[in-house]
Amino acid sequence: VVSYASIFSSCTKLVFVEVNRLEDREVIKIIDTCSDVTKENITKSPKLRKLLSIPRYLMYLLENEEQRGSISNVGELFEFIVDSSIDETLKKYDKPIRKENFKALVKRVIERIAFIMEISRKDKISKDDLYTIIDELKGNMAHMLVANFDLLFFESRILKETNGILQFGNSEIQEYLAAKELGRQDNIESVLYDVAVQKELKHIYPNWYDVIPHLSYSKDRSDSFVNVFKLITAYESHLENETFESLLRYVNPSTLGAQQRADLFSNLFEHYQRVPAYIKWRGPIENLIQECY
């Protein structure tokens, strides 16, 4: 083992700055300056509050609020965070690449990575695993990314690196990106059955309960969300109420068609006929039932 004690002992007058997470009360104070719609969306995601305790991500929230106004759903904020992280990386990355072409490629690649990590039920991968994923991609741009492999964890802005192990900065960013990749599949319900259901026990792997809600706030994927939700309730007839309600935390009935609202109402009605659970007065579930009725 090489000792660096002698090297450090020769250094004098060193100055460093340590950036710590913000305390919860400080984060709340800053979030309170945002619009009511933004605050409501942040409240829906317990993991998002923890992410915003990191100063860099809190700055992204404020930049988004300043540039675009309120966020209509958490997906808009996650998309802004991902875009900003990639932009910052490309700005500081000093290798000669066509940066304007790389952003879209990097986004698609990290969505694929997140999807594969969810299938594997992992929140961390090795550099070898990452290289294998990238190497299997097709096209000239993918080969360019292989040649600039370190871009994906440069300064830990896109993927966070710790001793050669890589992960996303926050588990919900991984879940959001995985949901985007899932949403691109031709038959989402069939794909989800293949990757998320334990066939012998007819049991859905728990990590997908955090991925699936991100399908619900996109108008393009809301129909698939309702079908996926029906699939889950069919397999998990004794689903705990907390998990059941968590799946619905991002649902916006205004993005649903009449038949989708009717199907969702039927699922809600049947669930609360079976489960002796209290529905909070003027809470999100009661509002959802009213709007779907």
Question: PLM ranges: what are they?
Answer:
Residues 2-186, 193, 197-201:
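Extended hydrophobic
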